[in-house]
Amino acid sequence: MSTGQAHLNPYIEGDSVLHGLDSIIKTMSLLGLLIFIALIPTGAWAFYLLTGFLLLSGYLLAELHLMEMVKRSLFVELPFFFILVPLLLMRQSDTLVQFELLNRPLNISAAGAERFFNILVRSWFSILASILYASVTHFQEFASAMRALGIPSPIVAIWSFMWRYLVLLVNEAQRMLRARSARSGRVVGQQAKAGGSLAWRASVTGQMVGSMFLRSMERGERVYQAMVARGYDGEIRAHARPILRPFHKIFLSLELLIITLLVITAFQVYGLR
């Protein structure tokens, strides 16, 4: 594994139950859980607790460091938090909190707060589920499972190339940073930092970024031409094409049935809101 791939790869080595589970089963479970999270009605907190329990059980079965995974998920969740903040101020009925910002009165309504926390929890659970899946499933297993589930080959190819080109970009960036460090030494005992002003550093950084993308594009083109020369026609045939076996179809049917029953129950209890 290259250095860039080692930095990017979210997979965590292990011998837990989830690590050894069939990749198609894991992929169907992830997709089913994401669909269920998206369909939970607003305010159905009991079903959010059920989802949280399922995720906690998954992390325990995977034998992962729970707090480390939670920190990683919160880091990914942070942009969603700022995007969702305006929801707190969209509805003016049932005011919970009233305050002023820049001499302008603002109200946080009960309906807006409920919608804010619902979407925030949904996005966080989706991130936790995705991190759990990525931690116990190799990327190649994910691509094979997508092919087995009938996902169109161009989409699988785009995912595969995205991963490989991200690795390529990281490798190029690491090479350029090493070269920069080798050329930016300073005299032992010298207190001043090596290099010029802030504007000079910004100029050098911009040139490095531009050079990195040009070099990455050239290298990517060489890789693609080498693949075409070896018979690549849009589908990677490094492994035998996986197929859906009878137990996969049974599992998928049961999963869809359970999700349907849970969603119907949630809407009957909490209604459409």
Segments from the language model and where they lie:
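Transmembrane alpha-helix interface motif
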Residues: 1-43, 53-57, 171-273
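Structural signal for the C-terminal ends of transmembrane alpha-helices
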Residues: 39-40, 58-64, 136-137
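Short, aromatic-rich membrane-interface segments at the entry and exit
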Residues: 43-50, 68-71
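Membrane-helix interface segments
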Residues: 44, 65-66, 151-155
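Hydrophobic transmembrane alpha-helix segments characteristic of membrane transport
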Residues: 50-57, 140-145
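Alpha-helical transmembrane segments and their membrane-interface exit regions
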Residues: 54-62, 77-82
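Alpha-helical transmembrane segments and their helix-start/interface "positive-inside/aromatic belt" motifs
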Residues: 67-78, 251-254
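Juxtamembrane/interface alpha-helical elements of multi-pass membrane proteins
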Residues: 72-198
